[in-house]
Swiss-Prot record:
Compartment(s): Cell membrane
Cytoplasmic compartment spans: 65-73, 134-155, 225-254, 316-370
Protein name from the UniProt record: Lysophosphatidic acid receptor 4
Organism the protein comes from: Homo sapiens
Record keywords: Cell membrane, Disulfide bond, G-protein coupled receptor, Glycoprotein, Lipid-binding, Membrane, Receptor, Transducer, Transmembrane, Transmembrane helix
Gene: LPAR4
Keyword Membrane: yes
Extracellular side: 1-43, 95-112, 177-203, 276-294
Gene3D superfamilies hit by this protein: Rhodopsin 7-helix transmembrane proteins
Residues forming coiled coils: none
A Pfam family the protein falls into: 7tm_1
UniProt GO molecular function: lysophosphatidic acid binding; lysophosphatidic acid receptor activity
Amino acid sequence: MGDRRFIDFQFQDSNSSLRPRLGNATANNTCIVDDSFKYNLNGAVYSVVFILGLITNSVSLFVFCFRMKMRSETAIFITNLAVSDLLFVCTLPFKIFYNFNRHWPFGDTLCKISGTAFLTNIYGSMLFLTCISVDRFLAIVYPFRSRTIRTRRNSAIVCAGVWILVLSGGISASLFSTTNVNNATTTCFEGFSKRVWKTYLSKITIFIEVVGFIIPLILNVSCSSVVLRTLRKPATLSQIGTNKKKVLKMITVHMAVFVVCFVPYNSVLFLYALVRSQAITNCFLERFAKIMYPITLCLATLNCCFDPFIYYFTLESFQKSFYINAHIRMESLFKTETPLTTKPSLPAIQEEVSDQTTNNGGELMLESTF
């Protein structure tokens, strides 16, 4: 009987585009799906993500490390999120080459590293976003009682725990993958057998989905809902000294990234794990999962481009740094020209920004709060 094989990201089975249409070996077991479109789609999206993600996250890390003081607990979570994005982006050139050429010449080790980087980024991003959401929940709902919990030391410990968790999951999944050679063409992260799916990968996938997606999703929705409900009380805003509109922007951007990038991908992956482990045997669902997987995979990788919006709307000092640097660049552009009016110096600009921050409904506290 035909061993029907399918492709899904890091849990991809045999390459249907590199061999004649698999899945139609018998009349009784036919489920033909042509998903060869995914190679050009993945290659194009990865190229965009590589360029935009490399620029935005590199600039963000530069600002975090050299242009602003990392005083808040949330800044620690966001820095780790940027590092996770940047590490993944650095592996994308290999994936771009593979998808456009449909051949992996880089060896088994880089294949495993590439897969581990993907899992680490996807689930690390969700967990770091969850940390930010929980931190915001504590800061707004329990602004005084949470002071002993919300420390930079505790934030660093939590980040270390997240890295250990996602690296363990990513490495565990990558151990079962290897490069395969078919007709002088080498594939990467394709060729998992039914036995591997039933014995290992289905269990690893379900564990990763529960710990890395379902629990974070529940926490994000719950924390955001409670925060929104708390903000309806006028006394809350006077206690935390911040602006309601700013908090609403933070929550909106945060949840938009989570829902657009991660919910579709993990929903399809969960279905695919059930299909491959034969917990569900339905050709329509197999076709649906195989067609939708590359599309949702591309949405998931776009988180590297969207995360900088979270940095901007979450950290007040991040906005301030860009404001100051923009003025510095404007000064340098007109330095050789005779000015009609005296341009403000950098200290004056910093003082102006500081005054604006102080006067906007206690936004200075926003930095220490979020």
